[in-house]
Amino acid sequence: MNINKQRVLDEFFELIKIPCPSLGERQVADLLKQKLEELDGKVTEDMQAAKALNGTAGNIVADFTGTVAGAPRILLNAHMDCVNPCAGINPRMEDGVIKSDGTTILGGDDKGGVVAILETLRCLKEQNLPHGDIQVVFSVSEEQGCAGAKNLDTTLLHSDIGYALDSSGRPGKIIFAAPGQNKIFAKVHGKTAHGGVAPEKGINAIKKAAEILMDVPTSRIDEETTCNIGIIHGGSATNIVPDLVEIAMDCRSRNPEKLEKLTADIVAAYKKGGEKAGVPVDVEVKPSYKPYCLAKDSKVIRLAAQAAENLGLPVDITATGGGSDSSHFNGFGIPCTVLGTGMTNVHTVDEILLEEDLYMTCQWALDIICLAAKQ
């Protein structure tokens, strides 16, 4: 019941070399469809998500019939897209550490998870290992607010529990709780005028926005609640008084009541700030996903923890402040945890992945499936 380490490494290098920005996953999606079909999977491309997002590919869903009746049906998830810069990745190995050449990301987020799922499927087939039904979901656009999973055609899903292989932290890390997220968009309106000829006839939306933002909650609110002002757009030229500023932020909490209150407080702060500044402010709230909290003794957590212990891995059952596709799977009614894959310094050109962690993630995923078939 052992993985093929050389095959894992070769496939990881193969996949990370394919450019796959969010909404541009077509090339890697075609390759993964081929690989899944070669493993006897019933493969479906979820075009509902592709159309909703106007992307080049949809989520890839593949079903594999189990050999053990009554075993839990398990969903395995990883995402196909990467953040930029992800074109021209030139991987290298130095003393057991996989890294890029420093001009791009590495792509372990989340090709490490993709490779682990593929290797698990191969080992099950080649070694005739007992297993229950398996459903693989390779999602698109995870790096853009988990948009692929959010727009997934849920009629395709029929799993009992799920594992998203998509967390920083070494194998053995198991996420039992994650926050819900709301995105908040505000438009601060001013009045345009010539900045040199008649600035007093204008109302500077940038200055007004700055005044308003002084009273908008931000950063860490408490141990499980945060909010962040992430994007501000405004102005078109230095000699024009800007008449519009657009602000985007998100707020998160693992407590649904706290998330609701923080969202309401932010909206109220914008409205009150606009009244105080004497300018109109439009505010829109877009819920992204709901928080979840899995019992530490639930089946999905217990299986992952037992498999990790059997491999001698230190088990770390913990909460996170980040979102992932698992948030949506839990929302769809499938208890789903996130597993640590060893990805480090993600979303930067300093990203690395220990060779040992790449292999161990594959072995851990395989052992979870085999352990589930025995229970």
Please provide the spans of the model-predicted regions.
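Acidic/histidine-rich catalytic neighborhood of metal-dependent amide-processing enzymes
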Residues: T104-P179, C227, I231, T238-N239, ...
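N-terminal capping segment at the start of a domain
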Residues: M1-R26, P287, T344-T348
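Acidic-enriched catalytic cores of C-N bond-cleaving enzymes acting on peptides and small amides
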Residues: A198-I232, I240, E257-V281
